[in-house]
Every structure is written in C-alpha cells, then in structure tokens.
Amino acid sequence: MNSNRTPSQKVLARQEKIKAVALELFLTKGYQEISLSDIIKLSGGSYSNIYDGFKSKEGLFFEILDDICKKHFHLIYSKTQEIENGTLKEILTSFGLAFIEIFNQPEAVAFGKIIYSQVYDKDRHLANWIENNQQNFSYNILMDFFKQQNNSYMKKNAEKLAVLFCTMLKEPYHHLNVLINAPLKNKKEQKEHVEFVVNVFLNGINGSKA
C-alpha cells in the first residue's frame, strides 16, 4: 500500500473485488495476456485504485499470491492440528496429503507458470516476494514440529529436514506439471506417493519396506 493510513472498508472491499477479478483472469487467460484495463473493465475499479493499492500489475499478482500462500499455509496447519498428538508418521502423512493435494490442482500449475515468467523481472518482484514471505511457506509447519521433538538430530536439523520432506513430496512432479503440462496425480496416486515418501523419509532406503 502507498499510504500508511488504514484503508476504509469501502477501499478494502474494492481491492478484494479487483483481486478476485484479476485472479480469475490470470488463471483463465494467462498473466501476460491480461492488461490492467481488462481488470478494470470487469472489476469496476480504476487505474488509481490499482496504483494506490498494488502499485502495478506485478504488485497486484504478488498480493494475490500472498493471499493464496497464506490460505494454503493455514489449510495445511489445520490438517496437522487435527492429529496434534499423533505419531511422527501420522503427522507427516497428514501434512503430506494436504500439501500434495494443493500442488496437484490446476490453479497451482497456472500460478507456477506465472511465477516462472517472473524470473527475469528486472524489478525483482519475485525475489522480494520470496524474501518477505518465508514465514508463510508450508515447510515452517514441519520445522516447528521437528523443533518440538525430543530427538536432538531433528531439533538441530529441523529446517533442512522440513525443506527436504516438502521437496520429496513436490519434485520433480510440480516442475514437470508447470514446464511440460505433465498429468496431475489423482487421489490414489497422491496417497501412494505420500506413503512412499514418508516411508523413505523415516526409514531410509535400507530400512524401507518393499
């Protein structure tokens, strides 16, 4: 936001309408194909509304991405809290199922394509967004969980283990979904993949069951 004053309810409602319209357009027609005038036409807003609230089209996109990232974070957190006193395997499985379901939705692939398109942005919108939103990345849920365990190895390596587990769940599948439109996993495939990853993560190759 350009102003330090708290926006009025009317302004906030208008910004939410702009974000909702922009999200729908980005997902259905692609980021590059949509102009601010397209968003204004359907949202009933104005250029000043967008510039005052989001500064630019890129700013608007990353505001939307911020909202989605927070929504996914809270969704995964709530799923893991449902079995707060569960075993390590149960917690990892619950986290894994919620996490992988998100990345096997068309919306996640569409956003992945847009994010890739921002890599060469000279204004570093993507880099700045990543730097400023680390706290909303889902691996933090696992990192905090690992830090609470009695196992000293988990405590010491909590962040590395959390990032590794998320990477094992997501890659290379999400990259292939984004880059070459590889098929998304169905529910059965998601469950099987999570079970496989949890097994290897907890037991290693030698200790894993065939």
Regions found by a protein language model. Name each.
Residues 62-68, 72-76:
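Alpha-helical DNA-contacting segments of helix-turn-helix folds
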Residues 17, 21, 25-59, 63-64:
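Helix-turn-helix
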Residues 147-199:
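Hydrophobic/aromatic-rich alpha-helical bundle segments in the mid-to-C-terminal region
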Residues 63, 77-109, 155-165, 191:
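Hydrophobic alpha-helical connector segments
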Residues 31, 54, 116-122, 132-133:
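Short helix-capping/turn signature of helix-turn-helix
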Residues 103-126, 174-181:
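Amphipathic alpha-helical segments used for helix-helix packing
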Residues 1-13, 209-210:
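N-terminal intrinsically disordered/low-complexity leader segments
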Residues 90, 101, 110, 123-151, ...:
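Amphipathic alpha-helical packing segments from all-alpha helical-bundle domains
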